[in-house]
Each structure stands twice: as C-alpha cells, then as structure tokens.
Swiss-Prot record:
Function according to Swiss-Prot or TrEMBL: Toxic component of a type II toxin-antitoxin (TA) system. Acts as an endoribonuclease. Neutralized by coexpression with cognate antitoxin MazE2.
Keyword check for Hydrolase: yes
Superkingdom field: Bacteria
Keywords: Endonuclease, Hydrolase, Nuclease, Toxin-antitoxin system
Alphabetical list of Gene3D superfamilies matching this protein: 2.30.30.110
Family assignment from sequence similarity: Belongs to the PemK/MazF family.
Protein name stated in the entry: Probable endoribonuclease MazF2
EC number(s) stated in the UniProt entry for this protein: 3.1.-.-
GO biological process: mRNA catabolic process; rRNA catabolic process
Pfam annotation, one family: PemK_toxin
Quaternary data: Forms a complex with cognate antitoxin MazE2.
Gene Ontology MF: a single term: RNA endonuclease activity
Length: 102
C-alpha cells in the first residue's frame, strides 16, 4: 500500500473508493491508514480535487473530498483501483493544505 493509491475500502458508510494519504515508509507497517474519501457529489469547494475516469483511471468522474479525512484499519482495504500520477498527487497535497489551512 502506497501514498497516492486509490482503493475500494469498507468504511462506516459502506464500501467506497478512498485515496491513501499515509506516507510510504509507514503505510505497510501500521494497523491504520489515513485516507480521504472520493465522491461523485461535486460542490466546487477548495477542499475538492477533481478526478476524471479517462485521465485518472477511476471508475467514474469524481472528486477527492478533503473534508472527509479519516483512518481505516488495513483490514478494511478490499481492492486497489489505481495510483495517482506524481503530478496529481502533488495537486492532492496542495488541496489538503488548502482545505486544512496548514
């Protein structure tokens, strides 16, 4: 499991796609991983990063919703979908900064 990968995972709201944020050296060794949820609901917020099915190899056009960051146990991860390109991962990190104000 690596930062920038998209996975289907069991979440409290049901199975959904998530983006892994936990840094690489740690993600394979700890029991819980920091993730952010993907959704098809777009609100045009600074806390959203748009992904398209064609460019980002996701099942459908969606946004990464950085207002929905949480941890999931490693056992919750069901199936790897894809991995963001380095450029898109950089944009994700910028969106995280913008959404948290850090």
């Amino acid at each position: 499991m690596r930062r920038g990968e998209l996975w289907f995972a069991a979440t409290p709201g049901g199975d959904r796609p998530v983006l892994v944020l936990t840094r690489d050296p740690v993600a394979d060794r700890i029991g819980a991983v920091v993730v952010v949820a993907l959704t098809r609901t777009r609100r045009g917020l600074v806390s959203e990063l748009e992904l398209t099915a064609v460019e980002n190899r996701v099942p459908s056009d969606c946004v990464v919703n950085f207002d929905n960051i949480h941890t999931l146990p490693r056992t919750a991860f069901r199936r790897r979908i894809t991995r963001l390109s380095p450029a898109r991962l950089h944009e994700a990190c910028q969106t995280l900064r913008a959404s948290t104000g850090c």
